[in-house]
């Protein structure tokens, strides 16, 4: 991108080769006076779409995407990138990011925000009413000294494969105040994985995950999930806070968490350290709850207070198979339904 003629993505004179990228990588690695802007359906489909080198791409309307199976990078080659999708006025005042409105983006491969290489920084902000679809994996902060930030204020985000927030020595933060985030494929969601540090902060909107959800997974990992206000999480299969030598924390002051499927809600599993502090909101589990599970290295602590409500449809086990478990009840309510028993 040169921006020689105007801000219009579809104008050939704005590109260094004199053509709108088609079947080639589209690279925005500068932020000149004429900021690269997509304001209508793109006239040609690039291969990878890359925003790096301090570059900025504003997407105010229309549909854009990558070529079949190709990737989108926000931050690459030891540099930062900014992607604003939709009304860029919503990110005025020096706030940069990935703002989603009437436009639509389809990443046919992976979406990488400050990810897939060292020393990368990516910032994404999603708002208003359009759609973002990721056919591959979604990374926010991956690899050493790489930082990714993703904010969802409204709109619709759909991911078909794994989600990583803070992975492989990277730092990732996902903040959600509205909208919907849905994972459709049969793979896991990680917040803090394999020496990565991940945070998920949700005060509104709805997250729907159809597979395992791990907060703090693997050696050296630190994961934190904070839910408040009107936030809603629907998750199937295992929901584990602190797993396989990872450290995880769940703090809940409001909102609703519903765990469906046949698997379990586990706090501290297989050498993992998990801590849950619930002072409000409702957690419903349709199977077992284990606090400190599987071996002597597992440690789980669950503190229930205030107006917090916990409902478990099967057993509640505090300290299982040599694990160390602590259940503190200083208010709130615990209900077991069905054939549920409590073991301490």
Where are these regions (language model features)?
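GD-rich hexapeptide-repeat beta-solenoids
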Residues: 6-10, 35-40, 182-183, 206, ...
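Short, solvent-exposed linear patches
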Residues: 118-121, 144-148, 168-172, 194-198, ...
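Small-residue (G/S/T/A) turn/hinge positions that recur once per unit in extracellular repeat modules
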Residues: 42, 55, 62-63, 81, ...
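Right-handed parallel beta-helix
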Residues: 63-134, 143
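Low-complexity/repetitive intrinsically disordered segments
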Residues: 333-344
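Feature marks extracellular polysaccharide-active and adherence modules
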Residues: 29, 39, 52, 58-60, ...
